Amino acid sequence: MKKLQLIIILFSLHSITFSQRKHQEISKKEGIKSIGMLKEFLSIPNDALNKEDISKNILWSTNKLNDFGFKTKLLTTSSLPLVVASKKINDKLPTIAFYMHLDGQSVDVSKWDQKSPWIPVVKKLESNKWIELDWNAIEDKENENIRIFARSSSDDKGPFIMLLTALNVLDIYNKEPAFNIKLILDFEEEKSSPGLPEAVAKYQTDLMADMLLILDGP
């Protein structure tokens, strides 16, 4: 009887380990596939002081969110607009709002060790120096300690793409989030969000949620 119990336990542990490994492999695969989307987004300049830059980022992000099944709305203010995107899973579920910003600070291009802050590159640290690699290096298992260099890669375009990638992984497993999703996208955070207080007062219904999480860097 004890031997049978031991066999069952060992089999269960093996099944759990195999399942975890499978999930990790799929997540990593989808993460690598999402790099193209991140690279495309990072290639759009997003200087918070440049309205033309911001307009292009608003257009790109809303189009992408629509592709992922979100309903988007532009919240106009006396400053630049915000975007609120909603994905309703079930009316009975709570709604979690995620605040993030997609603008970036102005840059001194001469201080960047690459052609442009808006031409993303892959680098690896070797002998205390960052060496630029080919983008295919991302798929090489031997190159796990590499970084993507571009303006706003971590603060804050990276988390935006990470969230969309996570939703894509859930779709692969035919799973749904356990809550309704609302995204609040600020395009002036790097200049103290002048339109945010006005939007909060003016669009209370659009911004209403049961919980708010701030995604400001991965």
Go through the PLM ranges and name each one.
Residues 1-22:
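Bacterial Sec-dependent N-terminal signal peptides
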Residues 6-7, 50, 156:
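Intrinsically disordered and other compositionally biased segments
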Residues 1, 92-93, 207-208:
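Short, well-ordered loop/turn elements at secondary-structure boundaries
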Residues 147-218:
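Acidic/histidine-rich catalytic neighborhood of metal-dependent amide-processing enzymes
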Residues 2-3, 87, 151, 157:
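Basic side chains
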